[in-house]
């Protein structure tokens, strides 16, 4: 008998057989800053109809044996593909914007594109906003610290950490290697129910 991943998880949950994961809370958003915060342009239900209409960005914490590391991700909201990522030992703008730069290098058209994130100081900074201006990307941000207004980005973070990054890396260098491998597997091999069991790469390449 073959069953899908989502059905299996719902079955386990129904019978209370799921193991509750213990998570260490680590705040990655500093929304108390002097920078301008852009309005939320997608809260009225904007839904992309193809890739490169909406990117969602977020930062997640990845502990190593030698200290902290932080993973910055940018995901295409239509295809669920991780189009940009970076790993560093800090959350400064210089480190975080590398994920945005990587995504922009792979961008295939110059049609209207929205970049949605929380109100973290990195995303609001002039250095990061300059990339928006230079590449004509529309900026959208959550209304305050509300993870539900950036739910897809949070979900992809969770998938990457709970399904692929299961081993604690030694240091940032090893974390970079592990994240690169995990992103490749996620993009090329992980089917999504929302994508009719296609992989992010399959959906992204179809356009």
Q: What is each PLM-predicted segment?
A:
Residues 1, 46-48, 64-65, 119, ...:
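Conserved, non-catalytic sequence blocks in retroelement Pol enzymes and Pol-derived host proteins
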Residues 1-50, 199-204:
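Basic, flexible linker segments flanking DNA-binding modules
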Residues 8, 12, 42, 58, ...:
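Mobile genetic element proteins and their domesticated derivatives, centered on retroelements
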Residues 21-27, 115-119, 134-152, 168-172:
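RNase H-like polynucleotidyl transferase catalytic core
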Residues 44, 48-83, 89:
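An active-site-proximal beta-strand-loop segment
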Residues 67, 85-108, 124:
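Active-site beta-loop-alpha junctions of metal-dependent nucleic acid enzymes
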Residues 109-124, 143-147, 196-200:
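Acidic/histidine-rich, metal-coordinating catalytic segments
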Residues 133-137, 159-207:
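C-terminal domain-tail junction helix/linker
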């Amino acid at each position: 008998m073959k069953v899908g991943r989502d059905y299996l998880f719902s079955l386990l949950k129904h019978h209370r057989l799921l193991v509750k994961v213990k998570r260490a809370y680590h705040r990655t958003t500093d929304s108390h800053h002097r920078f301008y915060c852009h309005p939320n342009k997608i809260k009225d239900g904007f839904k992309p109809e193809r890739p490169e209409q909406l990117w969602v960005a977020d930062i997640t914490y990845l502990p190593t044996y030698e200290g902290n590391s932080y993973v910055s991700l940018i995901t295409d909201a239509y295809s669920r593909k991780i189009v940009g990522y970076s790993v560093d030992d800090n959350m400064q703008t210089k480190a975080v914007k590398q994920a945005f730069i990587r995504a922009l290098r792979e961008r295939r058209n110059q049609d209207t594109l929205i970049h949605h994130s929380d109100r973290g100081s990195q995303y609001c900074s002039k250095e990061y906003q300059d990339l928006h201006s230079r590449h004509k990307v529309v900026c959208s941000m959550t209304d305050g610290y509300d993870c539900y207004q950036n739910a897809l980005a949070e979900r992809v973070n969770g998938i990457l950490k709970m399904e692929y990054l299961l081993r604690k890396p030694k240091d940032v260098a090893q974390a970079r290697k592990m994240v690169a491998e995990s992103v490749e597997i996620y993009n090329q091999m992980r089917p999504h129910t929302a994508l009719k069991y296609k992989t992010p790469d399959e959906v992204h390449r179809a356009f």
